[in-house]
From Swiss-Prot:
<dbReference type="InterPro" id="IPR029063">
    <property type="entry name" value="SAM-dependent_MTases_sf"/>
</dbReference>
<keyword id="KW-0808">Transferase</keyword>
<dbReference type="InterPro" id="IPR046977">
    <property type="entry name" value="RsmC/RlmG"/>
</dbReference>
<dbReference type="InterPro" id="IPR017237">
    <property type="entry name" value="rRNA_m2G-MeTrfase_RlmG"/>
</dbReference>
<comment type="similarity">
    <text>Belongs to the methyltransferase superfamily. RlmG family.</text>
</comment>
<dbReference type="InterPro" id="IPR007848">
    <property type="entry name" value="Small_mtfrase_dom"/>
</dbReference>
<dbReference type="GO" id="GO:0052916">
    <property type="term" value="F:23S rRNA (guanine(1835)-N(2))-methyltransferase activity"/>
</dbReference>
<comment type="function">
    <text>Specifically methylates the guanine in position 1835 (m2G1835) of 23S rRNA.</text>
</comment>
<keyword id="KW-0698">rRNA processing</keyword>
<dbReference type="GO" id="GO:0003676">
    <property type="term" value="F:nucleic acid binding"/>
</dbReference>
<keyword id="KW-0963">Cytoplasm</keyword>
<dbReference type="GO" id="GO:0005737">
    <property type="term" value="C:cytoplasm"/>
</dbReference>
<dbReference type="InterPro" id="IPR002052">
    <property type="entry name" value="DNA_methylase_N6_adenine_CS"/>
</dbReference>
<protein>
    <recommendedName>
        <fullName>Ribosomal RNA large subunit methyltransferase G</fullName>
        <ecNumber>2.1.1.174</ecNumber>
    </recommendedName>
</protein>
<keyword id="KW-0489">Methyltransferase</keyword>
<keyword id="KW-0949">S-adenosyl-L-methionine</keyword>
<dbReference type="Pfam" id="PF05175">
    <property type="entry name" value="MTS"/>
</dbReference>
Amino acid sequence: MNTEFIFADRQLSLIRYPEKHQHVSLQAWDSADELVIEHLESLLSENELSIGDNESTPSLMIFNDDFGALGCWFSHLAPYWVSDSYISLRSLHENLKANSLIRASEGSCTQELKTSPVKTLTSVESASFKPACAPAVVVIKVPRALALLEQQLIDLQAYITPETQVIATGKVKAITKSALNLFEKYIGPTTTSLAKKKSRLIFATPRDSLKQATSPYPTRWQCKSTMGAALIIDNLANTFARQSLDIGARIMLEHMTVSANDVVVDLGCGNGVLGVNALSLAPDAKVIFVDESYMALESARLNVLNNFPDKIEQCEFVASNCLETLLNRENKPAVTKILCNPPFHQQNAITDHIAWQMFTDSRDLLVKSGHLVVVGNRHLEYHIKLKKLFGGAKVLASDKKFVILGTAKR
């Protein structure tokens, strides 16, 4: 992996977290980062921007910084940094440390980030956030999910002014007509830059007297549990399968089994439908919902409250890179069953390292004879990975496209 970001006479060491699992061809920044850095540095050098470094002066806000490149570059401006991704947060943390922009200690990521000039907010926290002073500049890395962009623009309506410069950056293929329409709808007149290295900037000018729109999120739909009862499922903007039950989860619901005393992990939980279904099957089970998306975890929490509010104390909601957070605990939970529908994207890159790490972490966390149950497309051939790690896997159910595999820790 290329880790040396050399640009405009500066050099930063930047990694994609978790570094040890990344393909050598990947790096922690792209041309969209370079383009917005170049633009802002030009404005700063010509004194066309006035950005303060304390809460009572106009600030810089950064949204969706994939691996912390923008947060590190502009750390001297004490920006607010907003992300829905735990992995992005960990990347920012590691990169701030690598470039001596944060005090290293024996503390946790959260504790060390408190010493950083970069003020971090999760996407869930940012929904109710309002700075003391309107930001001078808002930089948005256009996300894959336009619903997330829509929610962020609605949130911004609460505190930006016509003097705020709203600048988005992204690959040309990400800057679609639909994305531009969102800026026009929620912010104001919108233009774009010329393309450079397959990236482009968006410039949106806030209208006078912006009124905050009503958010269309969370979206709500219903599905049937394994026992046939209706489950009410809410989905915040950046939640996988936001509009309907995905096919893999549907097959899992048809074939799930959970025992009364199980400690269940819903790994990569999304809206938590599998974990909520586990509570319907075994009301006394403990369920740990794990995801790297803060909106997913909040959706899962809402869905426990929607369907089994008296079981909320049996549930835990953990932001983590796969099962890393649980494995690093001094007192690890005695997990007997892990339910997993692995993703195969990290930000905009297609990768199989997430599935590998999920399976490896599951092997390490499960108690002896504990079970991992995986659903996935047939062509992903998860049975090969599971055989290497667990010694084999059994087909529990299948259709033309999907397969459910089960394996046990020996």
